[in-house]
Regions:
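Secondary-structure capping and boundary motifs in well-ordered enzyme cores
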Residues: 38, 65, 123-127
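Alpha-helical support elements that line or immediately flank enzyme active sites
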Residues: 69-81
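Structured beta-strand/loop patches that form or line metal/cofactor-binding pockets in enzymes
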Residues: 17, 21-60
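Alpha-helical macromolecular-interaction surfaces
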Residues: 67-68, 87
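C-terminal binding/interaction regions
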Residues: 1-22, 80-154
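Active-site phosphate/pyrophosphate-handling residues
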Residues: 42, 71, 129
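Short, thiol/selenol-centered motifs that function as redox-active sites or metal-ligating centers
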Residues: 60-67
Length: 154
């Protein structure tokens, strides 16, 4: 697989027209993420109510893979519980880092399938950090709350 194959239609669509792009007013949780290898920088904004993610958005700049992953992530996580978000992240992370398919609850299968276009980054280790930056940032936001944590994928 060459790098051009990574830029599938869905990746390009989300990179060119990211969904849920922009800051949320009064987020309950936020975090900043930075991938110094590629230059990706983003901030994730979340509203979590009663352990459920009611809204999630992001803003920042990054490569096509980073932007597409963040865009897909915002769509997938909205309406999920924090535990479900953790499960989707764990499955996605395993898939892009080791190629392992992690079983998820049946109600999360669609979420992990929607991330499949990004799994080709596994053969390009530097690009794995691009694909997972938004997910690590959401994890930091959930754990750090409204104070805003900064993470780096070095």
């Amino acid at each position: 697989m060459d790098l051009r194959e990574l830029y599938q239609d869905i990746i390009l669509d989300h990179a060119r027209s990211p969904r849920n792009f922009g800051a949320l007013s009064e987020p309950s949780h936020l975090a900043h993420g930075h991938n110094p290898l590629c230059g990706d920088k983003l901030t994730v904004f979340m509203k979590i109510d009663d352990d459920h993610i009611t809204k999630v958005s992001f803003e920042g700049r990054g490569c096509a893979i980073s932007t597409a992953s963040a865009s897909l992530m915002t769509q997938i996580l909205t309406g999920k519980s924090v535990a479900q978000a953790d499960a989707v992240f764990a499955a996605f992370h395993a898939r892009v880092t080791t190629g392992a398919a992690v079983e998820v609850a049946s109600d999360l299968e669609d979420a992990t399938e929607r991330l499949e276009p990004l799994t080709g980054v596994r053969t390009y280790p530097a690009r794995v950090k691009c694909a997972t930056l938004a997910w690590h940032t959401v994890d930091a936001a959930v754990k750090g709350g409204v104070l805003g944590t900064t993470i780096k994928t070095e």
